[in-house]
């Protein structure tokens, strides 16, 4: 078993790392300033500037693996990207996680990544041309509407949103929440999951349908803050769908295939999120160590107190273990497929956030009262 990185893996990871350290990190204060000015729900200029720079450098659309193990509905519209494997991209995603807005710079931010995968695997040529191409070019944003306030949405078969066919249209009624990205003024299209046939088998009742956000009957009711943070300019919204009509051509893959699409979509996304979470943890650990070395108490640096030595050691152990598990899951997805890797994918979904929360919490404690302020970025990371 060889744990060394290949030349290609190192090449792409290092390109992303170097771009972030040279371009993104030096502009982080500019980002925070622009984010705080005026309307919360806006396009942030420095992000657009960095996107253009990354695109020109060819560090763009890194997330799309060359194959999912399933034939595509359409192969006439190609995806423009380097075709990194899940493992190769996982290493890049960790670097992006170190600064919260970095993934958007490379056009690799959720939910667009998962939605582009849906279009690529399951979309028709027309659906790809209309929606995937502008997403691929970084011109628009998108949303994925599955979770509902009235049911336990971790079980996707509970979804209650109604999708009733009337002639050449579907009429959609329901309420979604935690609809990430809807607050962005560039968000133009949503993939909505609902039920088209309540009499079908349990996992064949659901469908996924494309709903333009400017369609009559789409109403953004409110934004949902997370621990008091609005996560602007993307946000998480509650969206009401009231008698929304869309053409039948907007259904993806066909009626009754929604659960199947959801399963195919969520696997790669968990690799992305978990590896970015490792980046968040690494950043928190670095801030913690810097703080502990810069402060003294009882005649020695705080870092020299045994409790902090233990916490730092535990943080390093937990990060290394989590990274290995994530990379194993990514490797399995590339070599044996997402279905066989389901166990590992489920494990990282639990391990990565638990690991990061503990390290961020320790970093907050190391900063004292400053840890819960906005000065160090730890409260928002938590």
Q: Over which residues does each language-model region extend?
A:
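Alpha-helical interface subdomain recognition
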Residues: 1-100, 109, 122-127, 134-139, ...
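Short glycine/proline-enriched turns and hinge-like loops at secondary-structure junctions
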Residues: 84, 154-157, 182-187, 201-205, ...
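N-terminal glycine-rich flavin-associated loop
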Residues: 104-126, 155
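A short, Trp-centered hydrophobic/proline-enriched beta-strand micro-motif
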Residues: 138-147, 192
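Glycine-rich phosphate/pyrophosphate-binding beta-alpha loops
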Residues: 152, 177-184, 268-272
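Cytochrome P450 core scaffold surrounding the K-helix E-X-X-R motif
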Residues: 153, 220, 250-255
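Flexible, small-/acidic-enriched active-site or ligand-binding loops
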Residues: 158, 216-245
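A short core secondary-structure module
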Residues: 168-169, 173-221
């Amino acid at each position: 078993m060889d744990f060394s990185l290949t030349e290609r893996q190192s090449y792409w990871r290092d390109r992303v790392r170097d771009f972030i350290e040279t371009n993104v990190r030096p502009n982080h204060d500019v980002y925070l300033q622009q984010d705080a000015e005026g309307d919360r729900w806006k396009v942030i200029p420095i992000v657009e500037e960095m996107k253009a720079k990354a695109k020109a450098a060819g560090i763009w659309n890194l997330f799309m693996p060359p194959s999912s193990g399933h034939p595509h509905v359409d192969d006439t519209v190609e995806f423009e990207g380097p075709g990194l494997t899940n493992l190769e991209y996982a290493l890049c995603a960790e670097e992006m996680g170190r600064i919260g807005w970095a993934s958007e710079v490379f056009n690799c931010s959720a939910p667009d990544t998962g939605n582009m995968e849906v279009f690529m695997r399951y979309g028709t040529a027309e659906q790809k041309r209309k929606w995937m191409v502008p997403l691929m070019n970084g011109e628009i944003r998108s949303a994925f509407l599955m979770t509902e306030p009235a049911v336990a949405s971790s079980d996707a078969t509970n979804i209650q949103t109604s999708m009733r066919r009337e002639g050449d249209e579907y009429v959609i009624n329901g309420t979604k929440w935690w609809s990430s990205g809807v607050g962005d003024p560039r968000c133009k299209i949503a993939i909505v999951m609902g039920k088209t046939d309540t009499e079908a088998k349990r996992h064949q009742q659901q469908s996924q349908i494309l709903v333009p956000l400017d369609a009559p009957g789409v109403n953004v009711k409110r934004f949902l803050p997370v621990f008091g943070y609005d996560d602007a300019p993307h946000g998480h919204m509650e969206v009401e769908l009231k008698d929304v009509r869309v053409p039948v051509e907007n259904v993806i893959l066909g009626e009754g295939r929604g659960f199947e699409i959801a399963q195919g979509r969520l696997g790669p996304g968990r690799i992305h999120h978990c590896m970015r979470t490792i980046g968040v943890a690494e950043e928190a650990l670095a801030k913690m160590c810097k703080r502990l070395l810069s402060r003294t108490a009882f005649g020695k640096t705080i870092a020299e107190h045994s409790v902090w030595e233990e916490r730092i050691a535990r943080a390093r152990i937990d990060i290394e273990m989590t990274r290995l598990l994530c990379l194993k899951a990514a490797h399995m997805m590339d070599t044996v497929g997402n279905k066989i890797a389901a166990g590992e994918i489920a494990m990282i979904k639990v391990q990565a956030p638990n690991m990061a929360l503990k390290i961020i919490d320790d970093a907050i404690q190391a900063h004292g009262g400053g840890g819960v302020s906005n000065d160090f970025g730890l409260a928002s990371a938590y």
